[in-house]
A protein has these predicted regions:
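Hydrophobic alpha-helical core bundles mediating ligand binding, dimerization, or RNAP-core interactions
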Residues: 8-11, 23, 53, 85, ...
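Short acidic-aromatic low-complexity motifs
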Residues: 1-28
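Alpha-helix boundary/capping residues
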Residues: 11, 26, 56, 130-131
Length: 139
């Protein structure tokens, strides 16, 4: 059975669909700060998680790979790490430097919860054609 660290590393290294299969049927991917941008902050189940990750991998940051991966906490059922992307956005055309912090909770060899924190200003630069300006104009 995979540990939380092994699951987190496989998520970091995997394609959108490969990463989605690591989640339990009732597993969730949370990016709570995306709510500040008006974006859904929680995705449940491998299918919904896969759809969101496909958007990230294919549209928002086509071909991205995580770099500078560091795992700071490693227990059988929890892992915490940071990982970075330097990628041109397929939406805005901007080069985005984004660091993620992820807390992975594992149960029965699957990801039960992966909660990620990120820089919402960098996310807005990649997610919207006019960056944070589009978020401000919506309010």
């Amino acid at each position: 059975m995979k540990t939380a660290k092994q699951l987190l590393q496989a998520y970091i290294d995997g394609s959108a669909q490969d990463s989605a299969t690591l989640f339990a049927d009732n597993g969730a991917l949370e990016l709570p700060y995306l709510a500040d941008l008006g974006v859904e902050p929680r995705y449940e189940g491998p299918r919904n998680i896969g759809a969101f990750l496909t958007f990230l991998h294919e549209k928002m940051y086509p071909g991205f790979k995580f770099v500078d991966v560091k795992i700071y906490i490693d227990t059988p059922d929890q892992a915490f790490g940071e990982y970075t992307i330097h990628q041109k956005s397929g939406i805005s055309g901007r080069l985005v430097h984004q660091r993620f912090f992820g807390h992975c909770v594992a149960a029965n060899g699957k990801i039960f919860l992966l909660r990620e924190a990120l820089n919402v200003l960098a996310a807005a630069d990649g997610m919207f054609p006019n960056g944070i300006g589009d978020v401000i104009n919506k309010r």
